[in-house]
From Swiss-Prot:
Gene3D superfamilies: 3.40.50.20, ATP-grasp fold, A domain, ATP-grasp fold, B domain. This is Formate-dependent phosphoribosylglycinamide formyltransferase. Residues 111-304 form the ATP-grasp domain. Keywords: ATP-binding, Ligase, Magnesium, Metal-binding, Nucleotide-binding, Purine biosynthesis. It comes from Erythrobacter litoralis (strain HTCC2594). The gene is purT. It comes from the Bacteria. It is an enzyme of class 6 (ligase). It catalyses: N(1)-(5-phospho-beta-D-ribosyl)glycinamide + formate + ATP = N(2)-formyl-N(1)-(5-phospho-beta-D-ribosyl)glycinamide + ADP + phosphate + H(+). Belongs to the PurK/PurT family. Involved in the de novo purine biosynthesis. Catalyzes the transfer of formate to 5-phospho-ribosyl-glycinamide (GAR), producing 5-phospho-ribosyl-N-formylglycinamide (FGAR). Formate is provided by PurU via hydrolysis of 10-formyl-tetrahydrofolate. Mg(2+) binds at residues 263, 275.
Length: 390
């Protein structure tokens, strides 16, 4: 099939689905991979492969089979040493094998930011057992946040306000770890005024920043996001300076092109680095309606060496997540018409089954200001009902 580029997508969730749509609009041929069949991105891709991204041999085999122009990781749990191997063989790993290695583990990216780049972060320590957790919490003070160095969507994260809750938090983190590293980060709880995601695009002509995205989390996972977030010019400048430092440092041996989701806490005028994702960010779903080029469009353009504007503008918009409440092998929906009556847009991700707190869709709304858009998005999300079982 004629195409402008061949992309191997490693991970096929809802963010991957939107990326596939953006890439295909630019003429790309996309092979979507995941550990289960009919994952969201597979439903819109040209071809698909089912494999574990933690199976090194399977990962090598799928790259050899398809020989892509770009290898695009969409998840954290990948054998990054294989990505380094294939990058050394001449494959273009997005944004680089080094970036995927560093950001797969919270300890690696935190140490890079705090120790090598001198970027402001919360106080933190690492722990491999409960005894070390107790010592780390004494160092950070209470409350503190405990989370696995490797997990996704906030799984395993908890806020601890007293020493008698440390064992429970450790057990929860261990139960939700990904990969084979039994290690957590214990960090100072920042009593922030708000938190933001700064979408940062590194492309052939330099770096482009999107307007800041505000977001609200529960259980360590995003529930709402809105753009543009109200933020002072000095605070925006500080966030941009830190984001540029980190994404530039992650180039490694690759091109380092793509979109990064850089998270910050903001307290007054102080901006504190939190985390970074070298791919489209879940809070950035709002850009599907807020920006003329969504985060997925920007990621595809940057990867493929296409033009990315130097300035991105956003109209007041918001997103609200639609969550499953229970486990079921079958799922259906009702209330779509009612959810869209107020002008909101609904994106159903097409996941084949449910479990508690699994993201099944998102409501998107625009308005005269972000408060109006947030209210509209939440109202729309509440009108879409998930049905479990036959």
């Amino acid at each position: 099939m004629p195409h402008t580029a061949k992309i191997l997508l490693l991970g096929s969730g809802e963010l991957g689905r939107e990326f596939v749509i953006s890439a295909k609009r630019l003429g790309a041929y996309v092979v979507a991979c995941d550990a289960y069949a009919a994952a969201p991105a597979m439903q819109v891709a040209d071809a698909s492969e089912v494999l574990s991204m933690l199976d090194a041999d399977a990962l090598r085999a799928v790259v050899a089979k398809h020989h892509p122009d770009y290898v695009v990781p969409e998840i954290e749990a990948i054998r990054t040493e294989v990505l380094a191997e294939i990058e050394a063989d001449g494959f273009n790993v997005v944004p680089s094998a080094y970036a995927t290695q560093m950001t797969m583990n919270r300890d690696a990216i935190r140490d890079l930011a705090a120790q090598e780049l001198g970027i402001t972060t919360s106080r933190y320590r690492y722990a491999k057992n409960l005894e070390e957790v107790r010592a780390a919490a004494e160092f950070t003070g209470y409350p503190c946040v405990i989370k696995p160095v490797m997990s996704s969507s906030g799984k395993g994260q908890s806020t601890v306000r007293s020493a008698d809750k440390l064992e429970e938090a450790w057990d929860y983190a261990v139960a939700n770890m990904r990969g084979d590293r039994k290690r957590v980060i214990v960090e100072q709880f920042i009593d922030f005024d708000y938190e933001i995601t700064l979408l940062t695009v590194r492309h052939k002509d330099g770096i482009t920043f999107c307007p800041p995205i505000g977001h609200r989390q529960e259980r360590g996972d995003y529930r709402e996001s809105w753009q543009p977030a109200t933020m002072s010019k000095p605070a925006i400048a500080a966030a941009q300076e830190m984001a540029e430092k980190v994404v530039t440092a992650l180039q490694g041996n690759g091109k380092g092109f793509g979109l990064f989701g850089v998270e910050f806490f903001v307290k007054g005028e102080e901006v504190i680095f939190s985390e970074l994702s070298p791919r489209p960010h879940d809070t950035g779903m709002v850009t599907s309606v807020s920006q003329n080029l969504s985060e997925f469009d920007l990621h595809a353009r940057a990867i493929m060496g296409l033009h990315v504007p130097s300035e991105i503008l956003a109209r007041p918009s918001a997103s609200a997540v639609i969550l499953a409440e229970q486990e079921s092998e079958t799922v259906s929906y009702s209330g779509l018409a009612a959810a869209m009556e107020g002008g909101a847009d609904i994106r159903i991700f097409g996941k084949p089954n449910t479990r508690p707190y699994r993201r099944m869709g998102v409501a998107l709304a625009t308005g005269g200001d972000t408060d109006y858009a947030r209210t509209a998005a939440v109202a729309a999300a509440n009108k879409l009902h998930i049905h479990y079982g036959d």
